[in-house]
Amino acid sequence: MSPIQYDYHHLPHVKTQNQSKKTLWITLVLTLFFTIVEIVGGLLSNSLALLSDSAHMASDVLALGLSMIALYLAMRPPNHRFTFGYLRFEIITSFLNGLTLAIISIGI
């Protein structure tokens, strides 16, 4: 009978967060840029479709901004109050984003 072997991957979480932070910044800036372009284009052309899509993209910018804040909070080291660190902020933000989408869909 062979012994049971356990393999724990102790990879640094911060390395993943740094890559995620870079990706989120790029996505946030691009989405914000296209949101502004759609608002200007919608106002200049009196297009309700462009203005509606820009409102949708503005909600995406808000969600990305919340994700960015959560990522920065999650990178804080543990302390006496939060002994496991601040990683739960990522989960709370994901829940809030999902809740916001549910409320918007009910409103539609």
UniProtKB/Swiss-Prot annotation:
One of its GO terms (cellular component) is plasma membrane. SUPFAM superfamilies: Cation efflux protein transmembrane domain-like. It is found in: Cell membrane. To cation A.eutrophus efflux system protein CzcD. One of its GO terms (molecular function) is zinc ion transmembrane transporter activity. This is Uncharacterized protein in glgB 5'region. The chain crosses the membrane at residues 24-44, 55-75, 88-108. InterPro entries: Cation_efflux, Cation_efflux_TMD_sf, CDF/SLC30A. Keywords: Cell membrane, Membrane, Transmembrane, Transmembrane helix. It comes from Geobacillus stearothermophilus. It is a multi-pass membrane protein.
